[in-house]
Design a protein with these regions (language model features):
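A basic- and aromatic-enriched beta-loop-alpha substructure that forms the phosphate/nucleotide-
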Residues: 55-131
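Short His-Asn-centered micro-motif
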Residues: 26-27, 74
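Helical scaffold of the NTase/Pol beta-like nucleotidyltransferase catalytic core
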Residues: 1-24
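Short loop/turn segments at secondary-structure transitions that flank enzyme active sites
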Residues: 48-51, 88-91, 134, 159-160
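Conserved nucleotidyltransferase catalytic core and NTase-mimicking acidic/glycine-rich helix/loop elements
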Residues: 112-172
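Catalytic metal-binding acidic patch
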Residues: 27-68
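Beta-sheet entry/capping signal
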Residues: 19-22, 41, 161
Length: 172
């Protein structure tokens, strides 16, 4: 599957005239509790051409591929990524700490080195608490609940605990 994902990422680069700087797995596979029917949640950061950044027209800052049963692929432009870092976006911190990396350039390591300067415990706690509450409402209110769905509530609660005790972004 890794070869197929890498091939799809190369196609994205070619079709969109971008360069992928980092591509990782996000979701249950990266969290370590994938089920046999889990899809691949591939997330990436990309850079457009220099000319694109000099345009006065708005250029879309997200690339999303249609979701199928096996693959869910989307990415953010590096400019959007920088804005999200400034806002201490917890999802961004997760992507850069994913244990499953499909593509990586030297940019990724340089970016990791500055991320902690922008980490906000408060924003992280709000994010994970909101995620736990939303997942609880969506997944645990039914009569029959799959065991995996409990992890979708437990993981953000444990992330909050990590942030409160370690004062750092939680590991993926």
């Amino acid at each position: 599957m890794k070869e197929l994902i890498t091939q799809k990422l190369r196609e994205i680069e070619k079709e969109n005239k971008v360069r992928i700087l980092l591509a990782v797995e996000s979701g249950s596979r990266a969290w370590g509790f994938a089920s046999p029917d889990s899809d691949y949640d591939v997330r990436f950061i990309y850079a457009r051409t220099r000319e694109d950044y000099l345009l006065f027209d708005d250029v879309r800052d997200v690339i999303e591929l249609p979701i199928n049963d096996a693959l869910d692929i989307n990415g953010w432009d590096v400019q959007k990524t920088l804005c999200l870092l400034y806002k201490s976006n917890p999802t961004l911190f997760e992507w850069f700490s994913s244990p499953i990396v499909y593509m990586e350039t030297p940019f990724a390591e340089r970016f990791r080195n500055i991320m902690m300067e922008y980490f906000s415990q408060k924003k992280s706690l709000y994010h994970y608490l909101s995620m736990a509450e939303g997942n609880y409402r969506e997944y645990l209110k039914g009569d029959i609940v799959k065991a995996k769905k409990y992890f979708y509530v437990l993981r953000p609660v444990l992330a909050c605990r990590w942030v409160l005790s370690k004062h750092t972004p939680p590991p993926m």
